[in-house]
């Protein structure tokens, strides 16, 4: 028996009964004018329709968004108000960078475990196309002062102090606030620190695209992705548009390094692209799901989050969170049928795989006697990963949960690990179970 019981006080498990996502679209393509809140409404509305559940039965929505929009600071509540749920449905938003929808799922699960609710929805949405574009500090101060002036002369005097540079928009920050380092720079550092070659990174990216293309071709992804009709409703998107359907390994070598032009190995092709999309799952108390006659996709067996330093190895979160989740589930790496790791960068993914198998890392960093073990690649990211599908930050966790549960079902059940790194030196891991 594990150290963690994801059950209600009466012993009922937390069941996942539905999962759905929009297609994932590269930045400034099909979802180029669609804000994250609308992507979130779109997927939740469709998921409820597919389960044929009365929206009024939903008691809680926990949703996340990493790229925040000032006009909709609580995306979860906007989704409730825009999808026909009861106005009394509780809703709040969370953010844990790239692990946001894992956090949303855990929060709903814990509400069910506590007996506060029977049914909840968790997920996330992000748009890398519809962004909050800032202004310079001087312009912001001038605009604030302008609102308090009374005469035309006062207004003109204020405006005359602004230079052309002050009027230029300020693009969204891509670096860590605390360190000034971007995710790509950290991936480059990890590639060098852990001797991850360019060839290894390109090979993993090629593998991811090849497996994702194969999964789509075999119809394995179709039922977990809705057809989206973004405004003005003149076109639709029904599959991810980042996947290289005819990926060729030799083509990856043609790209130049993106973050260290002279000595680097991290490129646009072995990194996940900026992406727009949304994903959601529906969780229920096990007995409630059976009472409503809903098919149970699977259960959350355990979960863990970890936090590490941000100056180096910031994307090593899976190597810290995974051993905790395995211990809490009372299992080992060898007990898993599937392992799905978020591929932010090929370098980060490969570095974590190395540390999974490193006794030295386990002893020096984790205080464990030995490593959790080497990953059997026949179990790893078997349908491809984020390098192929793309990565709308807050949506990736819910995509992984749904995709993993469906693949476990096809294989006759078992246990699976979902794990992700996240900005700020965070990591998430979740053990899923299908009977």
UniProtKB/Swiss-Prot annotation:
Reactions it catalyzes: an acyl-CoA + acetyl-CoA = a 3-oxoacyl-CoA + CoA
Active-site annotation: 98, 391, 421
UniProt GO MF annotations: acetyl-CoA C-acetyltransferase activity
InterPro entries, alphabetized: Ac-CoA_C-AcTrfase_FadI (IPR012806), Thiolase (IPR002155), Thiolase-like (IPR016039), Thiolase_C (IPR020617), Thiolase_CS (IPR020613), Thiolase_N (IPR020616)
Annotated metabolic or biological route of this protein: Lipid metabolism; fatty acid beta-oxidation
RNA-binding among keywords: no
Localization of this protein: Cytoplasm
Cytoplasm is among the record's keywords: yes
Oligomer status and interactors: Heterotetramer of two alpha chains (FadJ) and two beta chains (FadI).
PANTHER family registered for this protein in UniProt: ACETYL-COA ACETYLTRANSFERASE, CYTOSOLIC, ACETYL-COA C-ACYLTRANSFERASE
Assigned protein family: Belongs to the thiolase-like superfamily. Thiolase family.
Stated name of the protein: 3-ketoacyl-CoA thiolase
Native source organism of the sequence: Vibrio cholerae serotype O1 (strain ATCC 39315 / El Tor Inaba N16961)
